[in-house]
């Protein structure tokens, strides 16, 4: 419940509150095995929604719960899908990820056809029911794509023709699936003359292969760096962002899988360079990449050291007044950009992430150290996170963040300030109750504070 994820917020309604109703929620069924789930899906000729709850981010799960609470949504999923809700460490999820060759999956929505083929992967949660309606429509359309199924059957039978591999690469990239192995198999079949074509260069770029991958080495070996950069810049901005995001995701996964610190430093530099016109964003995302890496590989010593540096010298070093000015300037620029565009428009307020990260890392210190000096620093970060939220959130009713208060209360308790911790936690609970949101996790924390077991 302590980890806060920054979500995309509409300019017209930055903080949307949806009242949850269990009667209106998508109906989730329990299954003892993958075989049982697919058997029912095939019998009813329906696709499958596997909604995966985060192990660490309780608020992310609450957000999904709200998003899946809508009458129209319930009806659509009941008619077209078998839906099941699983936790990150459930055996059913392990069966599914093994079947579809997913290395890992933390949270979000997986859509399968009734044969067990992955047709859509969403790596986030949202409180917007409309988003889940859009996912359903997309999954239904993709489930009718018999072309991909036919290609996969031929691949499983041992075929490795150029035509088959290029078809699989193109189809799987549409559903954000890892195409690294397929691309390398395809490149192995090409002559040097074929590799040196712009078509091959485009194919490699569009797949967003990880840094240090053989495919990237190939393209930079046969083309000058300037040629590759020029080709990349020829794509529309939206496509370039997608390609960079693929590179970042695939490289991060590779670095974590092999605990490769050299690779993560290269990724940190790569991410910083994508924000070369904005030093603040370059510094923020570059440092966050390192901190997240050491957390994921469970290197506590390096994690705490990098997190402390990130907080002290970047996040905490900027005053509230400065953040307010920069946030206002950014927001005005976004409004100006909105005036030049047609249709819907959304953006993620960058400077709010300072508060989110301070909160998240303060709580990580609560979990990983008993050093009173470090905990005292974490308490300051936690307090600053609440101040940032209050200063930058435009909606008066959302300025107080109960989840940040929850972190603050936990740290107060650990530092021996039990009465103040109880008072803070009670205030956080009152805010959640006034908004009609779930209070279960915060009530559990309050109980542990009172009985001295937190």
Describe each region flagged by the PLM.
Residues 68-69, 102-147:
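Non-catalytic, surface beta->alpha helical segment in thiol-disulfide oxidoreductase systems
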Residues 44-48, 79-84, 106-107, 113-117:
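Loop/turn elements at helix/coil->beta-strand transitions in domains of secreted/extracellular proteins
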Residues 52-66:
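Conserved redox-active cysteine motifs that mediate thiol-disulfide chemistry
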Residues 28-48:
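A short beta-strand-turn-helix
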Residues 27-32, 52-53, 70-93:
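Thiol-based oxidoreductase modules, predominantly thioredoxin-like and allied folds used
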Residues 1-28:
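Bacterial Sec-dependent N-terminal signal peptides
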Residues 90-106:
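Structural alpha/beta surface segment adjacent to cysteine/selenocysteine redox centers
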Residues 152-454:
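Oxidative protein folding and maturation machinery
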């Amino acid at each position: 419940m302590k980890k806060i994820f920054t979500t995309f917020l509409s300019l017209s309604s930055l903080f949307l509150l949806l009242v949850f109703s269990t009667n209106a929620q998508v109906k989730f069924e329990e299954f003892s095995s993958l075989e049982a789930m697919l058997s029912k899906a095939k019998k009813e000729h329906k696709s499958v929604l596997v909604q995966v709850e985060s192990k660490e981010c309780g608020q992310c799960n609450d957000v999904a719960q709200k998003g899946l609470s809508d009458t129209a949504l319930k009806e659509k999923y009941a008619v077209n899908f078998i839906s099941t809700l699983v936790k990150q460490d459930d055996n059913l999820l392990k069966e599914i990820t093994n079947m579809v060759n997913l290395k890992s999956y933390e949270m979000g929505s997986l859509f399968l056809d009734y044969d067990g083929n992955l047709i859509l992967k969403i790596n986030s949660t949202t409180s917007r029911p409309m988003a889940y309606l859009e996912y359903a429509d997309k999954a239904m359309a993709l489930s009718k794509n018999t072309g991909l199924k036919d290609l996969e059957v031929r691949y499983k039978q041992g075929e490795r023709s150029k035509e088959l591999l290029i078809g699989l690469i193109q189809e799987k990239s549409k559903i954000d699936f890892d195409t690294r192995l397929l691309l390398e198999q395809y490149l192995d079949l090409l002559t040097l003359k074929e590799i040196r074509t712009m078509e091959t260069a485009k194919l490699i770029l569009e797949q967003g292969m990880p840094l240090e991958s053989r495919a990237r080495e190939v393209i930079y070996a046969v083309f000058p760096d300037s040629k590759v950069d020029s080709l990349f810049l020829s794509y529309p901005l939206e496509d370039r962002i997608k390609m960079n995001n693929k590179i970042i995701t695939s490289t991060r996964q590779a670095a974590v899988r092999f605990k490769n610190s050299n690779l993560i430093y290269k990724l940190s530099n790569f991410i910083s360079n994508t924000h070369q016109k904005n030093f603040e964003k370059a510094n923020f995302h570059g440092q966050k990449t390192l901190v997240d890496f050491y957390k994921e590989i469970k290197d506590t010593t390096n994690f705490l050291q990098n997190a402390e540096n990130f907080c002290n010298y970047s996040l905490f070093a900027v005053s509230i007044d400065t953040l307010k000015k920069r946030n206002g300037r950014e927001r005005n620029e976004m409004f100006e950009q909105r005036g030049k565009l047609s249709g819907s428009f959304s953006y993620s307020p960058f400077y709010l992430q300072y508060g989110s990260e301070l909160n998240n890392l303060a709580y990580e210190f609560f979990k990983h150290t008993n050093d009173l000096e470090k905990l005292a620093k974490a308490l300051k970060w936690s307090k600053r996170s609440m101040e940032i939220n209050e200063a930058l959130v435009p909606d008066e009713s959302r300025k107080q963040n109960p989840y940040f208060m929850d972190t603050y209360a936990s740290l107060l308790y650990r530092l021996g300030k039990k009465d103040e911790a109880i008072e803070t936690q009670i205030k956080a609970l009152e805010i959640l109750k006034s908004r009609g949101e779930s209070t279960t996790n915060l009530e559990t924390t309050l109980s542990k504070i009172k009985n001295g077991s937190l």
